[in-house]
Swiss-Prot record:
Originating species: Tolumonas auensis (strain DSM 9187 / NBRC 110442 / TA 4)
Matches recorded under Pfam families: K_trans, K_trans_C
NCBIfam families, per the entry: PRK10745.1
Segments passing through the bilayer: 9-29, 52-72, 101-121, 137-157, 169-189, 213-233, 247-267, 287-309, 337-357, 363-383, 396-416, 419-439
Catalytic reactions on record: K(+)(in) + H(+)(in) = K(+)(out) + H(+)(out)
UniProt KW keywords: Cell inner membrane, Cell membrane, Ion transport, Membrane, Potassium, Potassium transport, Symport, Transmembrane, Transmembrane helix, Transport
Designated name of the protein: Probable potassium transport system protein Kup
Superkingdom classification of source: Bacteria
Compartment list: Cell inner membrane
Function of the protein: Transport of potassium into the cell. Likely operates as a K(+):H(+) symporter.
Length: 622
């Protein structure tokens, strides 16, 4: 039983409010303000205000409530979600060519997520602290340094984990949503006719009147649904129903009340377009709202940082990224991890973004492309799963696909036009991450194929050992092997150069399945190949961390004990050399070689004692 099933529904729902809805829950800070930004240039008339409110309302209903909560959340891999999970599910029952296309789409979506993660903390924290200028313009020069200080503190505390303060996320975000709803409801009460914007007629009329400008304004409307991917990505932590319950009972009502409250305020006071969120609050409440909004944006930023840690671990375990040092920050929650390299690279990127863009308005143009690009990819992958995995009729899937793309594609295109205004940032970051993941996966495949060609078939080795009976030395030799085909090169080198073998030889392979967790009883498989040669296959899910001590413990339970003092681990250490291929292939090989040199060594990844490791070198052209 999962952790979220063991806890009470109210507790899990409260936790989901604190993590899942942090990003989308802080969107009212900047969304409506950006709808009236100078580059759009629309006046705050009744038709325009109603048009924007209607678009925001139907975006929250159709994209979040219908597409994600009713459709996409059905596509779980044993309870887990996320873009890479969706990619794995979509590729299970399709043809080889289709699988390749889906793989590329999934990696592009993963790259977009990394791009979005860089922007979210910067955008959120800046927009919260900009409330200081509403309280008093004299504090405006301090917004940027305070934002840098807040973000620095956020990334510094990552190594300590969020176990203790994480318990406050839910209550703080609940207070945040209560404040959103209350301020919005008070404003609506003063101008209740604003509720007429619930009618989609106003959205349609908005497009008929303003045409091209209305289309471009979708780039601001989409800010209302940024963070929607978290609903799917965090499904494994909280479960489907608590996420749905938190949305329909807390997040959605509060967001709608606040957006419509901002609209009512602008209709009665057009000057409020400068910062309608903070101007909703009475003057005495502005400072407390700045503090609360800063706390909410820090929580939202923490959620996406934790999300990128989780995605990175999943990508490493599935073979899309090189090995990294992954630290567990909680003895209770396996999902609470810290990846130092990712944390500090992300911090540097966020800092550069904050210093470069300086204001949330400047960042708004950069925000939408990654979000809407991921939305389009999610629609395609989810519909593929619906047809091939769930056996939904092709006609039904086509109707769903076309209907969802009619929403996603216009939102994406409206953001593409903002490419040179800042949209290049997530595209560039996404392209870099896609190139890294695709290169690592492809070049690893080529490397393993090359090593396989250089190896000896398992049957030939066993026959040779039984026939020639080389000299035996006491102890156990464990040879770590990447595949179950052929003999590890370290074993061949040891035999050819030292002409000896250990009394007991174990070929050990660690495999990762595209499921989050593997049944503990299925972790270890032991097979005898000859009287003194054994093969051990250790299988894990992509959310599990392999550990050689656990392998030993499970082997002992199956009757095969190991004495660490008399056991040596032999590893192949490849020296990679670029081959004479095309220029593009050589560039990929150079990137792969650099990634390999900086990746975590296998013995460190599976926690092999350093004093029991023997490395055997081999040169391979890639």
């Amino acid at each position: 039983m999962d952790a979220h099933q063991k806890q009470s529904l109210p507790a899990v729902t409260l936790a989901a409010i604190g993590v899942v809805y942090g990003d989308i829950g802080t969107s009212p800070l900047y969304t409506f303000k950006e709808c009236f930004s100078p580059h759009i240039g629309l006046p705050p008339t009744q038709q325009v205000v109603y048009g924007f409110l209607s678009l925001i309302f139907w975006a929250l209903i159709l994209v979040v409530s219908v597409k994600y909560l009713a459709f996409v959340l059905r596509a779980d891999n044993r309870g887990e979600g996320g873009i890479l999970t969706l990619m794995s599910l979509a590729g299970r029952n399709t043809y080889a060519g289709t699988t390749t296309v889906l793989l590329v789409l999934g990696l592009i979506g993963g790259g977009f997520f990394y791009g979005e993660v860089v922007i979210t903390p910067a955008m959120s924290v800046l927009s919260a602290l900009e409330g200081l200028s509403v309280a008093t313009p004299a504090l405006t020069p301090y917004i940027l340094p305070v934002a840098i200080a807040v973000l620095t503190a956020l990334f510094v505390i990552q190594k300590h984990g969020t176990g203790s303060v994480g318990k406050l996320f839910g209550p703080v975000m609940l207070l945040w949503f209560f404040s959103l709803g209350t301020l919005g409801a008070i404003s609506i009460f003063k101008n209740p006719q604003v509720l007429a914007a619930l009618n989609p007629h106003w959205a349609i009329q908005f497009f008929l009147t303003y045409k091209t400008v209305a289309f471009f304004s979708l780039g601001s409307v989409v800010l209302a649904i940024t963070g929607v991917e978290a609903l799917y990505a965090d499904m494994g932590h909280f479960g489907k129903f608590p996420i749905q319950l938190a949305w329909f009972t807390v997040a959605l009502p509060a967001l709608l009340l606040n957006y419509f409250g901002q609209g009512a305020l602008i209709l009665s006071n057009p000057e409020a377009i400068a910062n309608p969120f903070f101007m909703l609050a009475p003057e005495w409440l502005v400072f407390p709202m700045v503090i609360l909004s800063t706390m909410a944006t820090v929580i939202a930023s923490q959620a996406v940082i934790s999300g990128v840690f989780s995605l990175t671990r999943q990508a490493v375990r599935l073979g899309y990224l090189p090995g990294m040092n992954i630290l567990h920050t909680s003895e209770v929650e396996a999902g609470q991890i810290y990846i130092p390299f990712v944390n500090w690279m992300l911090y540097i990127a966020v800092l550069i973004v904050v210093v470069t863009f300086r204001e949330s308005t400047n960042l708004a143009a950069a925000y939408g492309i990654a979000v809407t690009g991921t939305m389009v990819i999610t629609t395609i992958l989810a519909c593929t799963v619906a047809h091939y995995n769930w056996d939904w009729p092709r006609r039904v899937v086509k109707i769903i696909l076309i209907s969802l793309l009619l929403i996603d594609v216009p939102l994406f295109l409206a953001n593409v036009v903002k490419f040179f205004a800042g949209g290049w940032l997530p595209v560039m970051l996404g392209a870099i991450m896609f190139m890294v993941m695709a290169t690592w996966k492809w070049e690893r495949f080529l490397l393993l194929r090359q090593l396989s060609r250089m190896s000896m078939p398992l049957e030939s080795f066993v026959a040779m050992v039984e026939k020639e009976t080389p000299q035996k030395v006491p102890g156990t030799a464990i040879y770590l092997s990447r595949t179950q085909q052929g003999i590890p090169h370290a074993l061949l080198h040891n035999l050819n150069h030292n002409h000896v073998l250990h009394e007991r030889i174990v070929l050990m392979t660690f495999r990762t399945q595209d499921v989050p967790y593997v049944d503990p009883d299925q972790h270890i498989e032991i097979k005898s190949l000859s009287p003194n040669v054994w093969r051990i296959s250790a299988t894990y899910g992509f959310h599990e961390t392999p550990d050689v001590y656990e392998v030993f413990r499970r082997c002992a339970m199956k009757g095969m004990a190991f004495n660490l003092n008399t056991t040596s681990f032999f590893l192949s250490r490849e020296t990679l050399l670029p081959s004479h291929r095309s220029i593009l292939a050589r560039l990929r090989a150079a990137l792969f070689i650099w990634l390999s040199k900086n990746s975590l060594r296998t013995n460190d990844f599976i926690h092999v004692p350093a004093d029991r490791v023997v490395e055997m070198g081999v040169q391979v052209e890639v």
